[in-house]
């Protein structure tokens, strides 16, 4: 990382420090003016032999601190550097010369500082201006490449007795979202499917954010979500693994979705809200997850400790734990300083593992309460640690003789098409829909030809369409009157004249004969009230 030149950094130093550096490098300075002294020093220091001689005199701690900088391209935020390698005392030039403090440095940082091997300057880092510790490039050119540190992976845990496999059902929820948004413009009741038909309702906010970011959805002039046909269909028509991977990678690369803002135990900083680069933090975290072996279980607490050991600044790359403070969701207490690491960073790590990574099927978990996890085959593949899992081909659609369509999981394009022509019934192991006059009328409003419906059903089921269903579908499309099955109540009264009462007559759907009438199920309570006001307490037979 190129910051300031060696000469510029020396020019910013006071004369006392320049004399200390010259003395320790065994450089005789002739000049008296600071610019000239800085120039002489920079000239004499930037030589291989001079750098090699100074490095040979470093103690182990100072060499380790210098190597730490070199492993990070020669620069680290000053706050992180001094936290790792010790303080630099704030002293004036008089005390420095009088007490000769460089002879007994209190830390590795102080040793490197008075040698001039480490300098300080502000630079753009993690989206802001941050004070950096760095090795001037004129010196680092002559330094050996630091040996990479071996990362000790997290300690494995025993397999739990109960395991919950991460799967690709979030992709099925995306189809539910597409279908509901597509249909609600014709039938507002379809909006209920966005909650009632979600297998992972807790992931709905993530799903909407990713779909918008990927261009599968957009907001219309009324700010309502609407599918974007071409990219949506492109996703629907690829194979199951490609759909799964596209959704997972959308999260991995997302700049809009902020995992920290979704942690339920945290509230935002009152001023800075959620001052974290969500994508950069996620990428740094996933780099640590890559140290987990596939198909190996790890305790959450052990992995959180591993993150703290390897990259505790994963959320705060500037190393500053005081510049912003989230709030405890329960008490509104400010969570400031490194002492709050477990309740901020620790909570974020646990949420990402048990939330998005699990929702996307990248990890498996144990049962509630969650205490451990492992990378799934899909997670290993997405993190480039293994091959993609082999997904079995889902069976064809099933069409019963009464017009109920069963759609297996992963038949996503077919399910989107089915929802355009059929009403949703229920879901568990698969999704079930029913062909009805209302659903087929809506299909006609979408200008779906009846021939296309018949061909689709035959192709998707792999069987010839039963003649009676073909006839029923064609009958609706031709506008013929059809049967209707309704939920009604039968009202019996001893005096037929009661049914002629104006307050009651408006609720009668159909008269059946002497003292009997049908009323709509939704009007039952109103009819009971009318009868009571007229001196009749009805008996209701509910079985």
Where in the sequence are the language-model features?
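Extended alpha-helical interface modules used as scaffolds for assembling large macromolecular complexes
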Residues: 162-171, 237-543
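Type-3 copper protein
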Residues: 1-338, 343, 351, 359-360, ...
